[in-house]
Amino acid sequence: SRFVMNKAGIVDPMRMMPRLEPRSNEEPSVMCEIAVAAAKQAMEQANVTADDIDAVLVAASNMERAYPAMAIEVQAELGIKGFAFDMNVACSSATFGIQQAYDMVVSGNARRVLIVNPEICTGHLNFRDRDSHFIFGDVATAVVIESAKHCRSDHAFEILDTKLQTIYSNNI
């Protein structure tokens, strides 16, 4: 960002310091809203409905609010029965969510698990820090983990193996 070729928009304070409008407790949170949009796409691509999902995991580096659990909010918005919970493992949250879902499917605790990774980073970024502000953004991804015998999609991936590892670093 130090070598800007086209400065259009970069001096706009609303882009440099975006703000999320507060929502009432009766409204879905912003994280829930983007998570639901991603979840619907993943479910459509997997050819499954809310009735086919046994569990919802929301795995994110930070949560918009502490409670209720974001996963339960997403579960309610999608009309999914079963259970839901949040996971927070910083940058590795999505990876750990996939591992947890895989373990649940392999053990027989769930037939299908929806993992959603909504990230809202703009709320706590310093957009004036030209060395790092461009790395982070707001996004949501989702995936359905299921066994091959339950798979309904022609475009599925196979999980061949998994292994998790964490290493402490304060170099953020």
At which residue positions do the language-model features occur?
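Condensing-enzyme catalytic core mediating Claisen C-C bond formation in acyl metabolism
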Residues: 1, 40, 44, 129-172
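Conserved "HGTGT" condensation-loop signature of ketosynthase/thiolase-family condensing enzymes
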Residues: 1-54, 78, 161-172
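Active-site nucleophile and cofactor-binding loops and adjacent substrate-binding regions
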Residues: 27-32, 56, 84-94, 134-136
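Active-site-proximal alpha-helical scaffold in enzymes
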Residues: 31-45, 88-116, 143-148
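Short acidic capping loops at alpha-helix termini that bridge into adjacent secondary structure
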Residues: 49-55, 82-83, 111-112
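Acidic, glycine-rich active-site loops and adjacent beta-strand->loop/helix elements
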Residues: 59-65, 89-93, 117-122, 163-165
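A glycine- and small-aliphatic-rich helix-loop capping segment at beta-alpha/alpha-beta transitions
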Residues: 69-80, 102-107, 130-135
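Flexible, glycine-rich active-site loops centered on histidine and acidic residues
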Residues: 108-140
